[in-house]
Structures are given as structure tokens and as C-alpha cells.
Amino acid sequence: MDSVNIAALVLRLALGGTVIAHGWNHAFGGGKLPGTARWFESIGIRPGRVHALSATVTELGAGALLVLGLLTPLAAAAVVGTMVVALVANHARNGFFIFRPGEGYEYVLMITLVSCALGALDGGAWSLDHVAGFSVPGWAGLAIAALAGIGGAALLLATSWRPAPAASPAPASESAPAA
């Protein structure tokens, strides 16, 4: 059983650390929080400042909870939610591979699936969940991580995502060269 606990610890530290770094970059990287807010606005998630702050706090908090192994399925659900929003609002239209122009959905999909797996796996014996006697492993943990995350993302997208309309092609008479 130690192999499962080792896997849970490695996944929690890797995923939690990555999500913390992502949230930290929202707040303190390049354009800082105002730059993140402008980026949210540019992909149609409005108001940008509210969502930049919300995403930053969610990623920092969920990442810390994962590292500690505290409320693991709920922390995983928070990560699933933020990644599903990123997938739908920005990455899906760019194809699968992250190296493609516009960055495809490969990265956010993997973070989402690892989060779901960690929800199913639970925090493991070396977690604060274990110390507190909190455990929701298996299908129940997976359901919490996946369904709460997807549900939260769907709610956010339904209420706050307003992408710019796609440009319609010019009528044939306007695009054809004059004779």
C-alpha cells in the first residue's frame, strides 16, 4: 500500500506546486494582476479584474490544499474548474498540442485529468486528510473532483464568458476581383 501513498504524495506535490506557480504568475508575473485582468477581458471573461483575482486566489488556495493533502477532492475540483474554463474559453479552439499557435488544450486537459485522478486516489496516508480522518476515495472522490469542477466551470462560463463574435466571411461579390 505504500506505493499508492507514494503516488498520492508525488501527484499532490507536483500538481499543487504547479497550480501554485500558475496562480503566483497571475498575480506577480509579467503584467501582474492588471495584465491577467486584461487577458481575461481579451478572451471574453468579464469583468476581467474580478475573474483574475478569483482565478489567482483559487489556484493559490487549491494548490496549497493539494500540497498539504487537505480536502483533496475539493481542492482537485477547484483545479478542474479553473482548467475547464481555460480549456473552453481559450485553448480548445487552438487544437490539441500546446506548441501550436495560441496554445492547444493538451496542458489544461492533462492538469484536469490528473486532478480527477487525485480526487479518486485521495490524499493518501501522508496527508492532513489522513490525520483528520477525512477520506473520500474512489468513485465518490472522482465524482466530487469532476462534477463539482465541471459544474463550477459551467456556471462561470454561463454567467461571465462573452466571447467576441466570430468575424463572418465577406460576401462573394465583395471578395471577388473586379472584371
What does each model-identified segment do?
Residues 36-44:
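Membrane-embedded helical hairpins/re-entrant loop segments and their flanking transmembrane helices
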Residues 57-66:
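Hydrophobic, membrane-inserted alpha-helices
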